[in-house]
UniProtKB/Swiss-Prot annotation:
This is NAD(P)H-quinone oxidoreductase subunit I. Residues 54-83, 94-123 form the 4Fe-4S ferredoxin-type domain. The keyword Signal does not apply. One of its GO terms (cellular component) is plasma membrane-derived thylakoid membrane. It is an enzyme of class 7 (translocase). Its EC number is 7.1.1.-. The keyword Metal-binding applies. One of its GO terms (molecular function) is iron ion binding. It comes from Thermosynechococcus vestitus (strain NIES-2133 / IAM M-273 / BP-1). HAMAP family: NDH1_NuoI (MF_01351). NDH-1 shuttles electrons from an unknown electron donor, via FMN and iron-sulfur (Fe-S) centers, to quinones in the respiratory and/or the photosynthetic chain. The immediate electron acceptor for the enzyme in this species is believed to be plastoquinone. Couples the redox reaction to proton translocation, and thus conserves the redox energy in a proton gradient. InterPro entries: 4Fe4S_Fe-S-bd, 4Fe4S_Fe_S_CS, NADH_quinone_OxRdtase_chainI, NDHI. Residues 174-196 are annotated as: Disordered.
Amino acid sequence: MKFLNQITNYAKEAVQSAKYIGQGLSVTFDHMRRRPITVQYPYEKLIPSERFRGRIHFEFDKCIACEVCVRVCPINLPVVDWVFNKELKKKELKHYSIDFGVCIFCANCVEYCPTNCLSVTEEYELATYDRHELNYDSVAMGRIPYKVTQDPMVTPIREFAYLPAGVMSGHDLPAGAQRAGERPEAIANTAKSSEN
């Protein structure tokens, strides 16, 4: 009797483990049917979603130096330097900066700014070799932001991680459109043939 119980328990455990292995393999096979998600980075870029929070854009003329952005920031990051103008009886902004090496891109400063002098952009390329270059002042933050779809040297790609196979066309581009200019391989071949 004890022997039959052991065989029964062994069979139940074998069936249960086969069920768990089948569940795991079903996820694996689901991912195998998807297309590869490789982006040839400087020549192809993913288009950020509408709610993407990238580099913060700052408009110096709109700022009233109220320091609301500093108060709502979880890490008190924005540096606002101002002087009180006695003639006009109001604050004058002298300097504004944010260190994007420390910023967590929560966009609280943008949300609570009363004059809308701060806005988030689609820019996500903030890589530098020196961390001090990530400390953007009002001039660097005032640069006009660019969109990936407007860069002629880049093929914009929609985020396609969860799209069905075959649906990978870029935003704002006609079907079959290529990026402007030649690919680096073609330029290198042209240079080699002109040297010969």
